[in-house]
Swiss-Prot record:
Residues 131-232 form the BACK domain. The lineage of its organism: Eukaryota, Metazoa, Chordata, Craniata, Vertebrata. InterPro entries: BACK, BTB-kelch_protein, BTB/POZ_dom, Kelch-typ_b-propeller, Kelch_1, SKP1/BTB/POZ_sf. Substrate-specific adapter of a BCR (BTB-CUL3-RBX1) E3 ubiquitin ligase complex that acts as a negative regulator of Wnt signaling pathway and ER-Golgi transport. The BCR(KLHL12) complex is involved in ER-Golgi transport by regulating the size of COPII coats, thereby playing a key role in collagen export, which is required for embryonic stem (ES) cells division. Negatively regulates the Wnt signaling pathway, possibly via the targeted ubiquitination and subsequent proteolysis of dvl2 and dvl3. Regulates convergent-extension movements during early embryonic development. The gene is klhl12. This is Kelch-like protein 12. Keywords: Cytoplasmic vesicle, Developmental protein, ER-Golgi transport, Kelch repeat, Repeat, Transport, Ubl conjugation pathway, Wnt signaling pathway. It comes from the Eukaryota.
Amino acid sequence: MAPKDIMTNSHAKSILNAMNALRKSNTLCDITLRVEGTDFPAHRIVLAACSDYFCAMFTSELAEKGKSFVDIQGLTASTMEILLDFVYTETVLVTVENVQELLPAACLLQLKGVKRACCDFLNSQLDPSNCLGIRDFAETHNCLDLMQAAELFSQKHFAEVVQQEEFMLLSQSEVEKLIKCDEIQVDSEEPVFEAVLNWVKHNRKEREPYLPDLLEYVRMPLLTPRYITDVIDAEPLIRCSLPCRDLVDEAKKFHLRPELRSEMQSPRTQARLGAKEVLLVIGGFGSQQSPIDIVEKYDPKTREWSFLPNIARKRRYVATVALNDRVYVIGGYDGRSRLSSVECLDYTADEDGVWYSVATMNVRRGLAGATTLGDMIYVAGGFDGSRRHTSMERYDPNIDQWSMLGDMQTAREGAGLVVASGLIYCLGGYDGLNILNSVERYDPHTGHWTSVTPMANKRSGAGVALLNDHIYVVGGFDGTAHLSSVEVYNIRTDYWTTVANMTTPRCYVGATVLRGRLYAIAGYDGNSLLSSIECYDPVIDSWEVVTSMATQRCDAGVCVLREK
């Protein structure tokens, strides 16, 4: 029989446990580390094996080589105790309270495992309120992966980050670095302009001189004419600065003289790159007069369509949302019954992904509205085959569970659901007797629905999306005609206006925002199913047909996914 090496995972662990017991009983210890007057007995060989810092100290010709006591400066006794526990046990508890001391100490003593654990912990704690501070902390301690992760987080969540105290405390050069970045993800330049203005006003006396320089990096020509005239022109800080007025005039000229745009090209006239976003169109009612399971993906950069794996169950009247790199296909109608089942696609750019089932809703729902708020999915209304619902339920993907929430005032199917400023809006729909123009708003903090100003037109099967802090409602059916009209709701003024009509009437149409523009996807025009996609540019208040899918459909689920 040939000899064979046998390895056991428990051997190294048992040695560490024995060494730790010896340390705690001060047995065979040959070095004492003194920190803030507290002595920590230890074994040179263990310290040297875990730390390049101690290895150099005990094996080179440093003064500490022959000493039995070593003073360690630059960390606290409590931190030293945590680090020694790691050396002897290979475990460390990183907390919000200790990480700011633990990471610098781990860097000082060159304990790579603790440094990595601290970086992983801080990465998991990234939030709009702390990402800028974590980025600076990571840069100070040469944690390059964490620094990059924090930068990407601040770019992805720019609109939220600039509302935090950390942003207000940045230096002028740090603000400039952030707003000039091509990769910040914003639907328009409005939050960029407002971020600069708010930063200046936070300390106007000292910061006002920086305003013209910072506005150089705001892409004002890409703002809507209405925003330029109503907001920017009315701002006193802009009106009293000639360099700022010059930038505003450039933006106005860009709109008033479109024939000169080719001569005005500069970084200010180029859209930010942001993340690579793709549009998914899922299921629906197809040309065979039945529900379909086809999933198509549109890349706006290449203007090309491709197919993804089909959903497991054919569905029309389906609701779809994207959340944390996953796509959820919710409820619908399979041709026989309304569904409570939910399918999920875990999607990455280099893989097609696989559909799998998650927890079913508490209620069967077709033509329900769906949206996301925070890390939760909300679904409201819909038709179960016998009645329309007022109910709303929420899905928590962390525990794979649905829970019921407060009922709407009106039962609705075919209504749109969208989040704006932390509130959930439900718009239009059909109550079983009438097509509706009413709008309700849900406050997650109070759990109550309240009515707001209704739409000008009754609409069911309309597309709903949020663009530049305004809710757009496109197309739908009013009981008589299939609509091409578009209404816009200002959440600040509780007021509705109209913008340019779509090129084609569309009912059971999907709507979403992609790279700062509003897309209306497929639908039914009153005569035939559509495969065309049109796009609305709010800067010039105009729609254009940009592409067509391979599949004619209505009642489809649509969402935008950011590719990694």
